[in-house]
Amino acid sequence: MTLVAITYTRGSLHILNQLLLPHQTTYDPLHSARDAWHAIHEMRVRGAPAIAIVAALSLAVELHTLATNNQLSAEPKDVELLILEKLEFLVSSRPTAVNLAEAAGRLGRIVNGRAQVQGVGGNEVAEAYIEAAERMLEDDVRDNRAIGESGAKWVLEHAITTKGSMSGTGQAKVAVLTHCNTGSLATAGYGTALGVIRSLHATGSLERAYCTETRPYNQGSRLTAFELVHDNIPATLITDNMAAALLARQSAGPAQSVGVSAIIVGADRVAANGDTANKIGTYGLAVLAKYHGVKFLVAAPRTTIDMNTKTGADIVIEERPEKEVTKIRGPRVGEEGNGLGAMETITVAADGIGVWNPAFDVTPAALVDGIITEVGVVEKDGSGVFHLERIF
């Protein structure tokens, strides 16, 4: 059973506080759009699909509360304006991920259409919004499973290495490297890149998953490793600067006998030409994959593809606080590594050093072998060009 990071019933929304993982499992209630803005900005919830869903549902909860308490205007245009203002506010929480802006635009159009219907009141406009936001939650889980199945099939057909063990069906097994966190903690459930790994594991086709630590926020060691252990998927954690050595090795010991066949990552925004903004460090992995002849795949729902952004040069890259690089937070442990004490923050850098901390980098489309979506895997044509418009 996979982790559940978002729990929702009408009028109630809770998120798993990812800042406390893997040491504490705490669900935070969100009652309003403002609550969600802070949760997203503070990265208590993260991952492009997840933040869009949490943002949308937080406003659904707020509208439900207002309607229940008879605090919504009876005028449809007033409610529409309220919703649009709050959606705009939510989009400002993290600017790079396109899913949030895409969801806000889509929900805004639904609200606008409902508000223009003759005889409709304010509560009915709010109801239209709530129903649309709830569908987003259902659709994301369905889409993630489709991404997982499509990606697993493509990997087994295109990225098999000759070395390694066989599954029970005689299919060669694969080892996959992933970066950051793209699983149940980053989506409504199952995951995108991690969903592909889950699908490979479910069919007995996965030899081993490798996950990077993903500095400076350690989403790999804190979150992806947590999910892999939770699901009993055979996995190994590496630091970010070990990836080249891993790809160069033909064998990593008796328990890890398959060379990496594919690197699969998620995305926060994919430009129309296939350039991909994702967690910092993704670009470097793509360069390594090209050198070592390893398939490099991006797994993302179509809502992550921004056809209005022509190339990666047009993507705004969020920069995070210096303290995320110079300090690290975790529980105190004994000298033998046993026991979990109070959470503490320690410094790991020289005082006074300058820090550059971009949250994302952009991987050129030329380094991407395929983009895994819920409707299949998009590959480049003979000229090396993605035609992403064909999947819409």
Swiss-Prot record:
<keyword id="KW-0028">Amino-acid biosynthesis</keyword>
<dbReference type="InterPro" id="IPR011559">
    <property type="entry name" value="Initiation_fac_2B_a/b/d"/>
</dbReference>
<dbReference type="InterPro" id="IPR037171">
    <property type="entry name" value="NagB/RpiA_transferase-like"/>
</dbReference>
<comment type="pathway">
    <text>Amino-acid biosynthesis; L-methionine biosynthesis via salvage pathway; L-methionine from S-methyl-5-thio-alpha-D-ribose 1-phosphate: step 1/6.</text>
</comment>
<dbReference type="InterPro" id="IPR027363">
    <property type="entry name" value="M1Pi_N"/>
</dbReference>
<keyword id="KW-0963">Cytoplasm</keyword>
<dbReference type="GO" id="GO:0046523">
    <property type="term" value="F:S-methyl-5-thioribose-1-phosphate isomerase activity"/>
</dbReference>
<keyword id="KW-0413">Isomerase</keyword>
<keyword id="KW-0486">Methionine biosynthesis</keyword>
<comment type="function">
    <text>Catalyzes the interconversion of methylthioribose-1-phosphate (MTR-1-P) into methylthioribulose-1-phosphate (MTRu-1-P).</text>
</comment>
<feature type="active site" description="Proton donor">
    <location>
        <position position="268"/>
    </location>
</feature>
<dbReference type="InterPro" id="IPR005251">
    <property type="entry name" value="IF-M1Pi"/>
</dbReference>
<comment type="similarity">
    <text>Belongs to the eIF-2B alpha/beta/delta subunits family. MtnA subfamily.</text>
</comment>
<dbReference type="GO" id="GO:0019509">
    <property type="term" value="P:L-methionine salvage from methylthioadenosine"/>
</dbReference>
<dbReference type="InterPro" id="IPR000649">
    <property type="entry name" value="IF-2B-related"/>
</dbReference>
<dbReference type="InterPro" id="IPR042529">
    <property type="entry name" value="IF_2B-like_C"/>
</dbReference>
<keyword id="KW-0539">Nucleus</keyword>
<dbReference type="GO" id="GO:0005737">
    <property type="term" value="C:cytoplasm"/>
</dbReference>
<protein>
    <recommendedName>
        <fullName>Methylthioribose-1-phosphate isomerase</fullName>
        <ecNumber>5.3.1.23</ecNumber>
    </recommendedName>
</protein>
<feature type="site" description="Transition state stabilizer">
    <location>
        <position position="180"/>
    </location>
</feature>
<dbReference type="Pfam" id="PF01008">
    <property type="entry name" value="IF-2B"/>
</dbReference>
<dbReference type="GO" id="GO:0005634">
    <property type="term" value="C:nucleus"/>
</dbReference>
